[in-house]
Regions:
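Extended acidic low-complexity intrinsically disordered regions
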Residues: 1-20
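Short acidic-hydrophobic surface loop/beta-edge motif
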Residues: 18-29
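Short, surface-exposed, charged amphipathic helix/loop patches that serve as local interaction elements
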Residues: 30-113
């Protein structure tokens, strides 16, 4: 019998737990430091599925759920609730979506949130 060799997988395969700080201009025209984390393929797939759902309520909350999954406080805890995310100004949502796209390398997503 051959012994199974333990393989070390590259960290680049996985979502990092790193908390990423970004200066983001919000609706008041001022820059604020916000924190984000990368999302997994599962969260990404849920977002895409929600965007194409036949259920209007699911589609309406797709971007809110993505923002909630990625935006955190400095300690990595969720920064806002789904209810708060639902109340984001459209321009702010688009800006946050662009930051989330950059962090996750979703080039095609920029400008779609």
């Amino acid at each position: 019998m051959s012994e199974k060799t333990e393989q070390t997988l590259p960290a680049a395969l996985f979502v990092s737990n790193e908390i990423i700080a970004r200066e983001v201009e919000l609706g008041d025209g001022k820059k604020h430091t916000l924190h984000f984390k990368a999302v997994s393929h599962v969260v990404f797939n849920r977002w895409v599925t929600a965007l194409t759902s036949t259920d209007e309520a699911v589609r309406d909350r797709a971007h809110s759920r993505l923002v909630c999954a990625s935006m955190v406080d400095a300690d990595g805890e969720p920064a806002l609730t789904i209810e708060q995310a639902d109340r984001l100004k459209p321009k702010v949502l688009r800006t946050l979506g662009d930051v989330i796209a950059e962090i996750n390398d979703f080039a095609d997503m920029r400008g779609n949130a």
